[in-house]
Swiss-Prot record:
InterPro entries the UniProt entry points to: SinR/SinI_dimer_dom (IPR010981), SinR/SinI_dimer_dom_sf (IPR036281)
Its biological purpose: Acts as an antagonist to SinR. SinI prevents SinR from binding to its target sequence on the gene for AprE.
Species the sequence originates in: Bacillus licheniformis
Subunit structure: Heterodimer with SinR.
Protein name per Swiss-Prot or TrEMBL: Protein SinI
Sin domain: residues covered: 2-40
Length: 58
């Protein structure tokens, strides 16, 4: 468990440094949130999937 705690602390420190550097470069906290959420999968189907179901292949 101590190993897990150390890894979490290291990751927390790394994220803190990354965010600090981003803020120094003029990147807003909202921009950081948007960027981080780009990789998250939504429960909503994408537009291309919705369209593909409406096309009759025959």
């Amino acid at each position: 468990m101590n190993k897990d705690k150390n890894e979490k602390e290291e990751l927390d420190e790394e994220w803190t440094e990354l965010i600090k550097h981003a803020l120094e470069q003029g990147i807003s906290p909202d921009d950081i949130r948007i960027f981080l959420n780009l990789g998250k999968k939504s429960s909503k189907p994408s537009a291309s999937i919705e369209r593909s179901h409406s096309i009759n292949p025959f």
